[in-house]
């Protein structure tokens, strides 16, 4: 199935039914009075988080969703039927943005979470409501109100605890295959991974965490090189980043230069995401002669001026991978416990997530501005025909 992580749709709630203008007419009741019923409420549009979905591809082919209208009222004080609510399923991890106001309406982070995105129109009132001591035969009714209509943008971000970061062909997909049941495509050429992959790393019966592998970055990704930065958004929900570095690249490039380029592109995408804890994972040590490994590792760490944790692994053979995932699990457990016990740590995490959402809105606004600009430029183009004068010659 094709992976689609962005989509734009239109939702429209149902219109409320109009109130009825009617008078009671029965035998021997010449002046029965008003009996017009109320219209029905329209249907609202709701989104529901569904953990069985992992792509927004359905919204690529159906972009308009409308809830039914309420039915009009009838005589004999009969109310119109309400329009049924429309429930639209979205993948867990979907951020819902109003394209017109850029308001973040909701972040669907749990299965079964329900979000109202378009409020139904209210019913109209029948003439029975306007009867009074001075107006025994009112001819007044009210129409149903229009349902809310919205232009929505969905941005899906995978739900993961740990994210893998690195250049293409650094061994990220091999690592996630080694420590989980995920089976992403692995090959000896760059950009093998074209979409994010998730793997559940199990360390015991009830101990596990989710790892995300995203397509690799290259220098200039912030300017559109390679696959650009669009997949980095899938790391914004993670708590820990593992920077995977190939110590023996096949093109004989400098691993330090590649690592610095990735760090720069990460900062270009999100200054807040760049503040996340990041561990250095030196991969493919098995490709180096054993006597060269310590000096190579020391050289990379020293030139990067790396002060955080460093792990030396071979993803293809599995050497060092268990120590890495066990350390990551311990760190995640300690972090969650700290946030549960320390209000300052909890607020810090919430503030980081808020800042990343603000950055996401800013990126969406910039993207929409770029889309609007060509249209505005077309409108402003000078057209000589606009100033043509039609001349009619008299016979």
UniProtKB/Swiss-Prot annotation:
<feature type="domain" description="OBG-type G">
    <location>
        <begin position="160"/>
        <end position="333"/>
    </location>
</feature>
<dbReference type="GO" id="GO:0003924">
    <property type="term" value="F:GTPase activity"/>
</dbReference>
<keyword id="KW-0378">Hydrolase</keyword>
<keyword id="KW-0479">Metal-binding</keyword>
<feature type="binding site">
    <location>
        <position position="173"/>
    </location>
    <ligand>
        <name>Mg(2+)</name>
    </ligand>
</feature>
<comment type="subunit">
    <text>Monomer.</text>
</comment>
<feature type="binding site">
    <location>
        <begin position="213"/>
        <end position="216"/>
    </location>
    <ligand>
        <name>GTP</name>
    </ligand>
</feature>
<dbReference type="GO" id="GO:0042254">
    <property type="term" value="P:ribosome biogenesis"/>
</dbReference>
<dbReference type="Pfam" id="PF01926">
    <property type="entry name" value="MMR_HSR1"/>
</dbReference>
<feature type="binding site">
    <location>
        <begin position="283"/>
        <end position="286"/>
    </location>
    <ligand>
        <name>GTP</name>
    </ligand>
</feature>
<feature type="compositionally biased region" description="Acidic residues">
    <location>
        <begin position="376"/>
        <end position="395"/>
    </location>
</feature>
<dbReference type="InterPro" id="IPR036726">
    <property type="entry name" value="GTP1_OBG_dom_sf"/>
</dbReference>
<dbReference type="InterPro" id="IPR045086">
    <property type="entry name" value="OBG_GTPase"/>
</dbReference>
<feature type="region of interest" description="Disordered">
    <location>
        <begin position="340"/>
        <end position="395"/>
    </location>
</feature>
<dbReference type="Pfam" id="PF01018">
    <property type="entry name" value="GTP1_OBG"/>
</dbReference>
<dbReference type="InterPro" id="IPR027417">
    <property type="entry name" value="P-loop_NTPase"/>
</dbReference>
<feature type="domain" description="Obg">
    <location>
        <begin position="1"/>
        <end position="159"/>
    </location>
</feature>
<comment type="similarity">
    <text>Belongs to the TRAFAC class OBG-HflX-like GTPase superfamily. OBG GTPase family.</text>
</comment>
<dbReference type="InterPro" id="IPR006169">
    <property type="entry name" value="GTP1_OBG_dom"/>
</dbReference>
<dbReference type="GO" id="GO:0000287">
    <property type="term" value="F:magnesium ion binding"/>
</dbReference>
<dbReference type="InterPro" id="IPR014100">
    <property type="entry name" value="GTP-bd_Obg/CgtA"/>
</dbReference>
<dbReference type="InterPro" id="IPR006074">
    <property type="entry name" value="GTP1-OBG_CS"/>
</dbReference>
<feature type="binding site">
    <location>
        <begin position="166"/>
        <end position="173"/>
    </location>
    <ligand>
        <name>GTP</name>
    </ligand>
</feature>
<feature type="compositionally biased region" description="Basic and acidic residues">
    <location>
        <begin position="340"/>
        <end position="368"/>
    </location>
</feature>
<feature type="binding site">
    <location>
        <begin position="191"/>
        <end position="195"/>
    </location>
    <ligand>
        <name>GTP</name>
    </ligand>
</feature>
<protein>
    <recommendedName>
        <fullName>GTPase Obg</fullName>
        <ecNumber>3.6.5.-</ecNumber>
    </recommendedName>
</protein>
<dbReference type="InterPro" id="IPR006073">
    <property type="entry name" value="GTP-bd"/>
</dbReference>
<comment type="function">
    <text>An essential GTPase which binds GTP, GDP and possibly (p)ppGpp with moderate affinity, with high nucleotide exchange rates and a fairly low GTP hydrolysis rate. Plays a role in control of the cell cycle, stress response, ribosome biogenesis and in those bacteria that undergo differentiation, in morphogenesis control.</text>
</comment>
<dbReference type="InterPro" id="IPR031167">
    <property type="entry name" value="G_OBG"/>
</dbReference>
<feature type="binding site">
    <location>
        <begin position="314"/>
        <end position="316"/>
    </location>
    <ligand>
        <name>GTP</name>
    </ligand>
</feature>
<keyword id="KW-0460">Magnesium</keyword>
<keyword id="KW-0547">Nucleotide-binding</keyword>
<feature type="region of interest" description="Disordered">
    <location>
        <begin position="128"/>
        <end position="147"/>
    </location>
</feature>
<dbReference type="GO" id="GO:0005737">
    <property type="term" value="C:cytoplasm"/>
</dbReference>
<dbReference type="GO" id="GO:0005525">
    <property type="term" value="F:GTP binding"/>
</dbReference>
<keyword id="KW-0342">GTP-binding</keyword>
<keyword id="KW-0963">Cytoplasm</keyword>
<feature type="binding site">
    <location>
        <position position="193"/>
    </location>
    <ligand>
        <name>Mg(2+)</name>
    </ligand>
</feature>
